[in-house]
From Swiss-Prot:
Organism: Rattus norvegicus
Role noted for this protein: Transcriptional regulator. Recognizes and binds to the DNA sequence 5'-GCGGGGGCG-3' (GSG). Activates the transcription of target genes whose products are required for mitogenesis and differentiation.
Lineage top rank: taxon: Eukaryota
Gene Ontology CC annotations of this record: nucleus
UniProt KW Zinc keyword: yes
Membrane-spanning segments: none
One GO term of the biological process aspect: cellular response to growth factor stimulus
Protein's name in the database: Early growth response protein 4
PANTHER family named in the record: EARLY GROWTH RESPONSE PROTEIN 4 (PTHR23235:SF58), KRUEPPEL-LIKE TRANSCRIPTION FACTOR (PTHR23235)
PROSITE patterns in the cross-refs: ZINC_FINGER_C2H2_1, ZINC_FINGER_C2H2_2
Region of interest called Disordered, as start-end residue ranges on this chain: 15-37
Gene that encodes it: Egr4
Length: 478
């Protein structure tokens, strides 16, 4: 076995001898070189081991070791110092652990802690587990998951069931690791549980190979994430059952009642020709056939109203009545009216809105159609508007509701009263475009404009007779 002295650096080795040198007078006698015993006089013939152990023990020999020769100076290149020796073990004469510890001491690697050194350390001295496999008893044994470890150990190292345990995957090793490579258990019960894991793996094989497989892929370690993440697994299954129910093994794992999502299932041959694309009747959630559970009133709903594609036509109108009549208990249900009859009326209303100013409920006749005839037998007049007919009837009845306030004259039409008032006021809002003459009524202006048209025609005839049109001139140019 390998026994190592835990030194932090070269200063730890020189601290005690340096203090002894500071308090020792220079007159102390020195050991002559000839009085030094030979290497053969020491047990084992190891002079270097004896010298280092004697200097570390203290006393006069310690002072003499460090005062002999020139003044000691701290070596610059040393990073590790200590004493080691190999002690043969009868049970394992060729144990690879001793060779690994020897190589780690020479190369400056971190050695595995001994049980005495680990027991003597306090929780504050060990902020993190010393060995790479210190977490193995806690990770792979279910009995050790609730053991009481030092508080600083739990602050520095993750727990066995933590979600971040996969980040430490390179440090994990299979459960059949030598017990000597593990952290020392805190109690005899932990020691007995840790001794159950043994195997032929060598330390360097475990460090180089890493952890085989994923986290939680061995033995009892699989139960911990399943137990702690059961709620997450349930939510994932619920999400999968809603998004892709066809991939589930059976109807037992479905979250919705059977038939709840089968409202639009197709039945090609049940509805006759031309109705292969129409889905079947709405099935209530209580049962697959619609006979069990509540919601039996859904059976009478025809398929024409439940089509998600909005199919409407003569076929849906034909089979809806027969379908309701064939169903049990559907004789008292009134057959729905076909929606195909309401569409032409809607189109007509839209055309009426776009074509004219009247609303859809207006009873105005179409343009160029005189639907309002005079009720008087001797009169054959027809009118396109009702207000025109009302004005015409005032001629037959002699009713004159409009009276002038100046001369008290009555008129049957309001426009006649307006033009009459202009005679009293002298207002002439209409003017001729050619001569500028003004008129009180628009019809008077129109008659006057005809006079100018006749004068223009006469002047063009005169110019044509004189030959001005041959020169490219016209009356307008003159």
């Amino acid at each position: 076995m390998l026994h190592l002295s835990d030194f932090s650096g070269p200063d730890a080795l020189l601290s005690k001898p340096t203090e002894g040198c500071a308090h020792t007078s220079p007159e102390l006698p020195r050991l002559p070189a000839r009085d030094a015993p030979s290497a053969a006089a020491y047990p084992g013939g190891d002079f270097l081991s004896w010298a280092l152990s004697t200097c570390g023990a203290g006393g006069d020999l310690t002072d003499s070791c460090f005062l002999e020769g020139p003044a000691p100076t701290p070596p610059s290149g040393l990073s590790y110092s200590g004493s080691f020796f190999i002690q043969a073990v009868p049970e394992h004469p060729h144990d690879p652990e001793a060779l690994f510890n020897l190589m780690s001491g020479i190369l400056g690697l971190a050695p595995f802690p001994s049980p005495e050194a680990a027991a003597s350390r306090s929780p504050l001295d060990v902020p993190f587990p010393a060995g790479p496999d210190a977490l193995l008893p806690d990770l792979y044994s279910p009995d050790l998951s609730s053991a009481a470890f030092p508080e600083a150990f739990w602050e520095a190292a993750p727990s066995a069931g933590a979600p971040s345990q996969c980040l430490f995957e390179p440090q994990l090793s299979p459960p059949d690791v030598k017990p000597g490579l593990r952290a020392p258990p805190a109690s005899p019960a932990l020691d007995a549980a840790a001794s159950a894991f043994k195997g032929p793996y060598a330390p360097w094989e475990l460090l180089s190979a890493g952890a085989p497989g994923n986290c939680g892929s061995q033995g009892s370690f699989q139960t911990t994430p399943e137990a702690r993440f059961s709620a997450v697994g349930t939510k994932v299954e619920d999400l999968l059952s809603i998004s892709c129910p066809a991939e589930l093994p059976g109807p037992a794992s479905r979250l919705y009642p059977p038939g709840a999502y089968d409202a639009f299932s197709l039945a090609p041959g049940d509805l006759g020709e031309g109705t292969e694309g129409l889905p079947a009747l709405l099935t209530p959630p209580g049962g697959e056939g619609g006979s069990g559970g509540e919601g039996g009133e859904f059976l009478a709903v025809p398929q024409a109203q439940l089509s998600p594609l909005g199919l409407r036509g003569a076929a849906t109108a034909d089979f809806s009545k027969a379908l309701v009549a064939d169903l049990p208990g559907g004789s008292g249900v009134a057959a729905p009216s076909s929606p195909a009859t309401s569409f032409p009326a809607a189109k007509a209303r839209r055309k009426g809105r776009r074509g004219g100013k009247c609303s859809a409920r207006c009873f105005c006749p179409r343009p160029h159609v005189k639907a309002f005839a005079c009720p008087v037998e001797s009169c054959v007049r027809t009118f396109a508007r009702s207000d025109e007919l009302n004005r015409h009837l005032r001629i037959h009845t002699g009713h004159k509701p409009f009276q002038c306030r100046i001369c008290l004259r009555n008129f049957s039409r309001s426009d006649h009263l307006t033009t009459h008032v202009r005679t009293h006021t002298g207002e002439k809002p209409f003017a001729c475009d050619v001569c500028g003459r003004r008129f009180a009524r628009s019809d008077e202006k129109k008659r006057h404009s005809k006079v100018h048209l006749k004068q223009k025609a006469r002047a063009e005839e005169r110019l044509k007779g004189l030959g001005f049109y041959s020169l490219g001139l016209s009356f307008a140019a003159l």
